[in-house]
């Protein structure tokens, strides 16, 4: 199976590393998963016989530009690569844009037009125009998978749509942002104020340099929109979510909650057609009371009742785990 990776930051490099590490396993159980092109904002590296993935990672880390890949590197836009390079699947992992969805939206739609399946970790297009993307994929007869867009390594979307097939999902609640969960955990355990806990999260690389989307709840809002649309058949956008972040939470509030048998968590919730992201009181003994950077999602269903999945919600290798699962699904659906 021939693959184009669009976007070669932390997640793109994570996919390359996982495909390299798993190459023997994939060849033995499926077939060779060959990366024939990698693009970033500088250009591309293209080899129809398959790029050397360790070399690609080394070039990117040393020079910052994939176009510097020896002999196979060139100045070429991602759109032109999608149009001109023969491949089965495009893995779209450019940074998420929650305002317009681009460039990822354009990359995905262009892939569909060129009869290429798509796997993405990109929240932007999914949170803004999910219905359009699904309809375009169907129109062009290609598969569109996006497990990695919510919850990193946690199999949330595929669990609900495949393992729980036949169940009606009545509600979804969860902690879907590791940065905010880490900050609240530090505030609770060590009595730190919000600013100190945020500073520590930045120093450890857990929080982004600009953590606004995380701490204001926008990242979680995008994720629950994706879950509402993909699992519960809604047609929501990020504008439909009532959002409140964690910046006003104090260690005193956490202390008082603890005294009463509760903690405070940033919860994303889909229930009765409403989408909410806000700090909520969670019982200490609740499955939703996970610590540190862990994520958790709880489904309320008509048949299986409550189903809970917990896991690492971020990280290049964890996200690559979900992308690999989607790639294998596409192989099983098209190549067998």
Swiss-Prot record:
Against PANTHER family, the record matches this protein to: HOMOSERINE DEHYDROGENASE (PTHR43331:SF1)
- Pathway the protein takes part in: Amino-acid biosynthesis; L-methionine biosynthesis via de novo pathway; L-homoserine from L-aspartate: step 3/3; Amino-acid biosynthesis; L-threonine biosynthesis; L-threonine from L-aspartate: step 3/5
Name the record gives this protein: Homoserine dehydrogenase
Q: Which organism is it from?
A: Methanocaldococcus jannaschii (strain ATCC 43067 / DSM 2661 / JAL-1 / JCM 10045 / NBRC 100440)
* Alphabetic keyword roster: Amino-acid biosynthesis, Metal-binding, Methionine biosynthesis, NAD, NADP, Oxidoreductase, Sodium, Threonine biosynthesis
- Record-listed Na(+) binding positions: 147, 150, 152
Where, in this chain's numbering, is NADPH bound? 8, 11, 94, 123, 315
Which SUPFAM superfamilies did the record assign?
Glyceraldehyde-3-phosphate dehydrogenase-like, C-terminal domain (SSF55347), NAD(P)-binding Rossmann-fold domains (SSF51735)
Its catalytic activity? L-homoserine + NADP(+) = L-aspartate 4-semialdehyde + NADPH + H(+); L-homoserine + NAD(+) = L-aspartate 4-semialdehyde + NADH + H(+)
Q: Which GO terms describe its molecular function?
A: homoserine dehydrogenase activity; metal ion binding; NAD+ binding; NADP binding
Pfam families, per the entry? Homoserine_dh (PF00742), NAD_binding_3 (PF03447)
> Which E.C. number(s) belong to this protein?
1.1.1.3
Q: Which PROSITE patterns match?
A: HOMOSER_DHGENASE (PS01042)
Its function, per the record, reads: Catalyzes the conversion of L-aspartate-beta-semialdehyde (L-Asa) to L-homoserine (L-Hse), the third step in the biosynthesis of threonine and methionine from aspartate.
- What is the required cofactor set for this protein? a metal cation
Per UniProt, NADP(+) binds at 11, 94, 123, 205, 208, 315
Into which EC class is this enzyme placed?
oxidoreductase
Cofactor note from UniProt? A sodium ion is seen in the structure; a metal ion may subtly affect the relative position of the nucleotide-binding region to influence enzyme activity, and could increase the stability of the enzyme.
GO BP term, example: methionine biosynthetic process
């Amino acid at each position: 199976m021939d693959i184009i990776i669009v976007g070669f930051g932390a997640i793109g490099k994570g996919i390359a590393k996982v495909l390299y590490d798993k190459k023997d396993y994939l060849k033995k159980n499926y077939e060779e998963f060959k990366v024939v092109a990698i693009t970033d904002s500088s250009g591309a590296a293209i080899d129809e016989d398959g790029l050397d993935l360790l070399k690609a990672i080394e070039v990117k880390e040393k020079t910052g530009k994939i176009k510097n890949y020896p002999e196979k590197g060139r100045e070429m836009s991602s759109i032109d690569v999608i149009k001109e390079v023969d491949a089965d699947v495009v893995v779209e992992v450019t940074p998420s844009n929650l305002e317009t969805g681009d460039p990822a939206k354009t990359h995905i739609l262009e892939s569909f037009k060129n009869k290429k399946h798509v796997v993405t970790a990109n929240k932007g297009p999914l949170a803004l125009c999910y219905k359009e993307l699904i309809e375009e994929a169907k129109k062009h007869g290609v598969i569109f998978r996006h497990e990695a867009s919510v919850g990193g390594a946690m199999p949330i979307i595929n669990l609900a749509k495949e393992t729980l097939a036949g169940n009606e999902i009545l509600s979804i609640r969860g902690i879907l942002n590791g940065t905010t969960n880490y900050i609240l955990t530090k505030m609770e355990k060590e009595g730190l104020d919000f600013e100190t806990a945020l500073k520590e999260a930045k120093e450890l690389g857990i929080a982004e340099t600009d953590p606004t989307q995380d701490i204001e709840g926008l990242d979680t809002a995008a994720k629950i929109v994706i879950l509402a649309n993909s699992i519960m058949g809604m047609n929501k956008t990020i504008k439909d979510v009532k959002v409140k972040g964690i910046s006003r939470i104090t260690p005193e509030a956490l202390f008082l909650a603890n005294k009463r048998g509760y903690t405070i968590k940033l919860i994303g919730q889909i229930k009765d057609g409403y989408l909410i992201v806000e700090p909520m009181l969670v019982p200490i003994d609740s499955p939703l009371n996970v610590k540190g950077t862990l994520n958790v999602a709880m489904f309320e269903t008509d048949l299986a009742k409550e189903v809970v999945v917990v896991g690492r919600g971020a990280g290049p290798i964890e996200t690559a785990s979900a992308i690999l699962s989607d790639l294998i699904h596409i192989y099983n659906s098209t190549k067998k």
